[in-house]
Amino acid sequence: MDDKKRTARYWIAFFILAVFLVILFVWNVNAGSIHLSVSEILNIIFRHQGDATAYNIIWEIRLPRILSVIILGGALSVSGFLLQTFFNNPIAGPFVLGISSGAKLVVALLMIYFLSRSISMGSAAMIIAAFIGSMISMGFVLLVAKKVHNMSMLVISGVMIGYICSAVTDFVVTFADDSNIVNLHNWSLGSFSGMSWGNVKVMAIVVLLTMVIVFFMSKPIGAYQLGEVYAQNMGVNIKLFRIGLILLSSILSACVTAFAGPISFVGIAVPHIVKSLLKTARPLLVIPACFLGGAVFCLFCDLIARTVFAPTELSISSVTAVFGAPVVIYIMIRRQKRN
């Protein structure tokens, strides 16, 4: 494939992702108990005109939720890409390796502690707690990685760590007495509901700053994909680089878990879908495409979660698993055939 065809393919891929993002954005804004026309939605969003009830629903409920889905979905996908690069494993991801579950455990424990004392827990505190949990889980995974050189065993160990963290979290939440604490059960299953503009502001700042650093690391990531020896010859400090990948992926996944709980398979499935669409593994292209792809995938799954059995809302993690798990199965089968 010559350069012109490659460039055209990249433009087409990004155009497709952008179109799906816009379509799903509008669809999500309109989905719910109150249905509005496109013109009414545009008037409410851009001109701040329209029915007071519809205005409040869109501006105070739907828009914060949709923007949260876009930001967190993109962050989770990029986090998965970074972990796949770090472990050189196509099925590595925050959920599979138990990182999301570790973050969930620490956040849940801290939320229970604060709520039992009638103290509100700020967004920053939630992110810090989730980051600590992510790093603890990552520490266990890295210890296993040193002992076990088989990537399949590493993934299995990560899954076991995740199950342990989830079991402890569920145990604590189940036996909580306070009604507010019991409501943590919905968060522990994964949900984008209840997002506020304050939440959006905090997560946007954290994710944006992290993504800027990830973009600056595009060239070292590309060199690392070709092997540690090649990366060292290109002047990459492997030790610092690997620490950077761990920190960045943990920050992104921690931000997602803090606000939406653990969300499965997005970090694994989306990077592979994006690479298949682009037909390249170049980080400079894959990273922004992963962010867009994660946003599109999560918008679609959140739409399904909200509307299929309305007014009952499904766990977002259940929906992402339904659409993401087949991709993982396909990856494993294809890898087995290659071997």
Where are these predicted regions, by residue range?
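Alpha-helical transmembrane segments in inner-membrane proteins
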Residues: 1-339
